[in-house]
Amino acid sequence: MKITPVKALTDNYIWMIQHGNHAVCVDPSEPSPVLEFLVRNRLMLAQTWVTHPHPDHEGGAAALWRGYMESPVYGESDIEAATHTVTAGTRFTFGNGQVTVWATPGHTDRHTSYLLETSDGIHVFCGDTLFSAGCGRVFTGTVEQLYDNFQRFNQLPEGTLFYPAHEYTAANLRFAAHIEPDNADIQTALKAAEHTPTLPVTLAHERRVNPFLRTEIPAVRQRAEALVGKTLNSGLEVFAALRELKNAYR
């Protein structure tokens, strides 16, 4: 199975998953890049997966379905183009892989991540939940939900690959360096982020550079406390403080 990022809009990635002469597209913000990819690689669209109902994730799903009406569109019930409604625990297949749906709200009150298990490991298509060195902004969900999902992600094998939907890595790493100026792994990742795409990333990598997965590290907690000017008594409080600090960071 081959997984390729296709650039769209300003900083979006539409992930294309190939098996034989069939493909899945994940979060098609617009149809044209997907159609061009399919034609160039002589592929048929087999499935579309949508993580949440923002235009830069579902904007091209309806047009793709009209062009490939035999190919299902997977998404929660608030995805207008969905032909196959998913909920937490929904399972289906693509090629030789098993897909499991996780409910991962926080960025939005309804958000889905798709875990694709293949012979070479677990691939997580996480939309706007986890970014490399960062996390999604909280819009209609809650920071508590986002924190809980990071704890759940952190229980996956360290070789798990994450496929976020945006190229935010360099900006996120600059914030991470602001939180942990002495973290050599962050400095190394910053240099590497000059070259894109920076994705996918392993869970092992994110544990070293993502402050939102490092809320139990004393240096992270102490830095967050110094910046917000109060004691933070739990991982959740550190996570919430980091999210507010990131919102204001320039």
Swiss-Prot record:
Cysteine disulfide links: none
Taxonomic path: Bacteria, Pseudomonadati, Pseudomonadota, Betaproteobacteria, Neisseriales
Keyword field contains Cell membrane: no
Pfam families per record: HAGH_C (PF16123), Lactamase_B (PF00753)
Keyword annotations: Hydrolase, Metal-binding, Zinc
Pathway assigned to this chain's UniProt record: Secondary metabolite metabolism; methylglyoxal degradation; (R)-lactate from methylglyoxal: step 2/2
Function of the molecule: Thiolesterase that catalyzes the hydrolysis of S-D-lactoyl-glutathione to form glutathione and D-lactic acid.
CDD domains assigned to the protein according to its UniProt record, in alphabetical order: hydroxyacylglutathione_hydrolase_MBL-fold
Alphabetical list of NCBIfam families matching this protein: GSH_gloB (TIGR03413)
Superkingdom of the organism of origin: Bacteria
Family that this chain belongs to: Belongs to the metallo-beta-lactamase superfamily. Glyoxalase II family.
This protein's name: Hydroxyacylglutathione hydrolase
